[in-house]
A protein has these predicted regions:
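Zn-dependent metallopeptidase/amidohydrolase metal-coordination segment
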Residues: 185-223
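Active-site/ligand-binding-proximal alpha/beta "capping" segment
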Residues: 144-181, 267
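Short acidic/polar active-site loop segments enriched in Thr and Asp
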Residues: 81-82, 181, 200
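Acidic, Ser/Thr-rich low-complexity intrinsically disordered segments
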Residues: 260-292
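Metabolite-binding pocket within alpha/beta catalytic cores that recognizes anionic/polar moieties
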Residues: 1-130, 286-292
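His/Asp/Glu-rich mid-to-C-terminal helical/loop segments that flank catalytic regions of hydrolases
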Residues: 212-260
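Generic non-transmembrane alpha-helical segments
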Residues: 136, 140-151, 238-246
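Non-catalytic positions within long, well-ordered alpha-helices that form the structural scaffold/packing
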Residues: 76-79, 176, 195
Length: 292
């Protein structure tokens, strides 16, 4: 079996990972451009951990400016087998108040203008996104949250907007009426790219606000979000520590095939593939491309 390496991408308010030991900082070059930050590579209770700050220290990158392809590519190059996204979000449900964590199991993509695939002209691939989140990772996260006494909803639909502006009231009411659970700006195309890279992926959506639909709460603003982020960051650190303590040391095969997503995805014939694109795909798709 393959050794498990847990990747963690920290969103707003999570620029470091408390509890990470034997840390070394490493910058890995990517053919897809510059990733958000250097990787902080270490361990928690003996489990190899690779941490990245999605917005970088000081929050210098907006959601639309993040190079999602480079981020996932360097995670793959660092040997990550399982990837956890810790992300701030707004809530559309009374039962998911600020401070609640949500184990997302579905996504709706409302972004535009972001590169959403490693593949394209010269090497076309179509991976399944029917079930975008690893059920195995969600189970491990749920058990860790329960052990730490962290309020956690075990399912929910995350709608990803482009940003950087927050929702209009009409948008917020539309998403609420459609039954979505939370809203954020970063988990897509991240989840899609993780699937293309055959990395098992799961999101912990950390609720900071009620967006702007709630009649008894003010419209979302950065000042209020930051206050909740501080409390959420402490819980996220405890969650990561407990998850690492109980996480299998050998990578478990994904029950939905996330780690074999490219087995039947690439449709371009070998002789029609663009050599330059194939070269860029060496980390992401080398397992299947090197065989022809």
């Amino acid at each position: 079996m393959t050794k498990a390496v847990l990747g963690i991408i920290g969103g707003s308010g999570l620029y470091e990972l408390p509890g990470l030991e034997n840390v070394r900082e490493k910058r890995i070059e990517s053919p897809w451009g510059e990733p958000s930050s250097a990787l902080r590579i270490g361990e928690i209770v003996g489990l190899p951990i690779v941490f990245m700050s999605r917005h970088d220290k000081g929050h210098r990158l907006s959601p639309s400016d993040i190079n999602y392809r480079a981020n996932i590519d360097v995670m793959k190059r660092a040997g990550v087998t399982d990837l956890i996204s810790l992300s701030a979000c707004g809530s559309f449900k009374e039962e998911l108040p600020p401070g609640t964590f949500v184990l997302v199991d579905q996504f709706v993509d409302r972004t535009f203008g972001r590169a959403s695939s490693f593949f394209g002209k010269g090497c076309v691939a179509h991976v399944s996104m029917a079930h975008p989140v690893s059920p195995r990772l969600r189970l491990h996260l749920a058990e860790a949250a329960e052990a730490e006494g962290i309020p956690m909803a075990r399912s929910g639909t995350y709608v990803c907007m482009e940003g950087p502006q927050f929702s209009t009231l009409a948008e917020s009411m539309t998403y609420k009426n459609l039954g979505y659970s939370v809203i954020g700006m970063t988990n897509l195309p991240e989840a899609k790219l993780a699937r293309e890279a055959e990395i098992c992926y799961a999101t912990v959506a950390m609720v900071t606000d009620f967006d702007c639909w709630h009649p008894d709460h003010d419209a979302v603003n950065v000042t209020d979000i930051i206050k909740v982020l501080m409390a959420n960051a402490e819980k996220a650190a405890r969650l990561a520590s407990r998850l690492a303590r109980d996480f299998p040391r050998e990578h478990e095969p994904c029950p939905i095939g996330s780690d074999r997503a490219l087995d039947t995805a690439i449709i371009t014939a070998p002789e029609a593939r663009d050599p330059q694109l194939v070269k860029k795909l060496d980390a992401v798709a080398g397992r299947v491309l090197k065989g022809g």
